[in-house]
A protein has these predicted regions:
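A glycine-rich helix N-cap at a beta->alpha junction
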Residues: 80-96
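Conserved small/polar residues in nucleotide/adenosyl-binding loops
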Residues: 114-116
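Boundary-proximal intrinsically disordered activation/regulatory segments immediately upstream
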Residues: 1-64
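Short, aromatic/basic amphipathic alpha-helical patches
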Residues: 69-81
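Glycine-rich phosphate-binding loops that contact phosphosugars or nucleotide phosphates
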Residues: 106
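Glycine/small-residue-rich phosphate/adenosyl-binding loop
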Residues: 99
Length: 116
């Protein structure tokens, strides 16, 4: 688990998340085989795969409140291989696709059958 802090609205991380969620997001998600899980329930489900070809969580974007919510409900060992970026509320508001973000986003990648 590697931690970083993002406070700039012009960060490449912000731009990537916005691109995946934006109007051209469907095409970008298909090409990159990536998507954004938004909110506590979606992120928990991504971290607890129930199927063999479940998506892999590459990076978590968390506010302080989002971090507390997530850690309260999961086994911390699930985060060992995940990059974690702490973000300000302003950055989360810019990245999230909802009016009232929960402070938790995950960048996920679909596994390909070719790699198995």
């Amino acid at each position: 688990m590697t931690n970083s802090h993002i406070s700039s609205l012009h960060s490449p991380h912000v731009e990537r998340v916005k691109a995946l969620l934006g109007p051209r997001g469907k095409k970008i998600r298909a090409v990159e085989k990536s998507f954004i899980a938004d909110g506590i329930q979606s992120v928990r489900e991504a971290l607890h795969p129930r199927i063999e070809l479940a998506p892999v969580v590459e990076r978590l974007y968390l506010t302080d409140v989002g971090r507390e919510r997530l850690i309260a409900g999961i086994d911390a060992r699930l985060l060992d291989s995940v990059e974690i970026s702490m973000v300000t509320d302003d950055v989360m508001n810019a990245m999230a696709d909802t009016e009232s973000p929960q402070g938790i986003l995950a960048l996920c990648t679909h596994l390909s059958l070719i790699h198995i």
